[in-house]
Amino acid sequence: MTGDAPQSAPQHRGSPAPAHVPVMLERVVELLAPALQQPGAIAVDGTLGLGGHAEALLRAHPGLRLVGVDRDTTALERARQRLAPYADRIDLVHAVYSDIPRILDELGIDRVHGLLFDLGVSSPQLDEAERGFAYSYDAPLDMRMDRTQERTAADIVNTYPASELTRIFRVYGEERFAARIAQAIVRQRAKEPVRTTGVLADLVRSAIPAAARRSGGHPAKRAFQALRIEVNSELSILERALPAALSRLAVAGRIVVLSYHSLEDRITKRVLTELSTDSTPPGLPVPLPDRQPELRLLTRGAELPTEQETAANPRAASARLRAAERTREP
């Protein structure tokens, strides 16, 4: 993993304020189209954000019913306003996308025909200083995607032992100076709690050797990514969410996943690859029907945005797209 893009081009689902440019929009719509053209098609956007992808899908498929899920109540309300012309065809739900099976049960939906996951942090979360996601602002150290949850980045920074902070920075941020950063935080909080993004960014910068700060973007980018992942349990939720959502995908239904760093992409690749592989034990004379692939991969590896898109929308630069189609019942 190369880490987050610089703050001027961070990983996430949109573009600099005030515009919102959905990442790889045309490709997402193209990949999902064959599954959504049938009468009565239902799609789930598990990371609704500001609703850019959802709007394009609803416009492209006049008979489509769309379930939009987001853990951020602010984003959900903005998406509701954006999607108001399609109000009779949408169900918007405040939830984490690992809850998709429960949500579908409550809506009386058995199978869906399209699944979309656009991972990472959204434009408003990065652009609104008070959310505490960005190291370019001095703001309360928050980083909660869902502000109804209690634990913040400040809670983690000020209460986790040095060993656990080191693990988070090393595993989630792939930060080679994880231990030095953790020790700097522990020393600082012994004097005064670390409460703001500015203080944390300065601590991280001072903990990293000067030679290592000369390249690779802002020195705090990996540490901030790691804390955000820990605050929001992003990877553990993704691990649960993909198999859970795929269990409700109809035959010939399609899934598209956009990820923005290698940890997300690694999980996505593993889940889709496992379900697209024949798991018949070696040595058997014939394949076992229940061990045949459930999915067919639609992308060769991870697809990248075009140079034209990244030039117009730098925040798309780190995007990686994978897609698959269900070929049999699970």
Swiss-Prot record:
It is found in: Cytoplasm. GO terms for cellular component: cytoplasm. Residues 276-330 are annotated as: Disordered. InterPro entries: RsmH (IPR002903), SAM-dep_MeTrfase_MraW_recog (IPR023397), SAM-dependent_MTases_sf (IPR029063). Its EC number is 2.1.1.199. S-adenosyl-L-methionine binds at residues 51-53, 70, 118, 125. One of its GO terms (biological process) is rRNA base methylation. It is an enzyme of class 2 (transferase). The keyword Ligase does not apply. Residues 311-321 have a biased composition (Low complexity). SUPFAM superfamilies: Putative methyltransferase TM0872, insert domain, S-adenosyl-L-methionine-dependent methyltransferases. Keywords: Cytoplasm, Methyltransferase, rRNA processing, S-adenosyl-L-methionine, Transferase. It catalyses: cytidine(1402) in 16S rRNA + S-adenosyl-L-methionine = N(4)-methylcytidine(1402) in 16S rRNA + S-adenosyl-L-homocysteine + H(+). One of its GO terms (molecular function) is rRNA (cytosine-N4-)-methyltransferase activity. Pfam families: Methyltransf_5 (PF01795). PANTHER family: 12S RRNA N4-METHYLCYTIDINE METHYLTRANSFERASE, S-ADENOSYL-METHYLTRANSFERASE MRAW. Specifically methylates the N4 position of cytidine in position 1402 (C1402) of 16S rRNA. Belongs to the methyltransferase superfamily. RsmH family. This is Ribosomal RNA small subunit methyltransferase H. It comes from Thermobifida fusca (strain YX). The gene is rsmH.
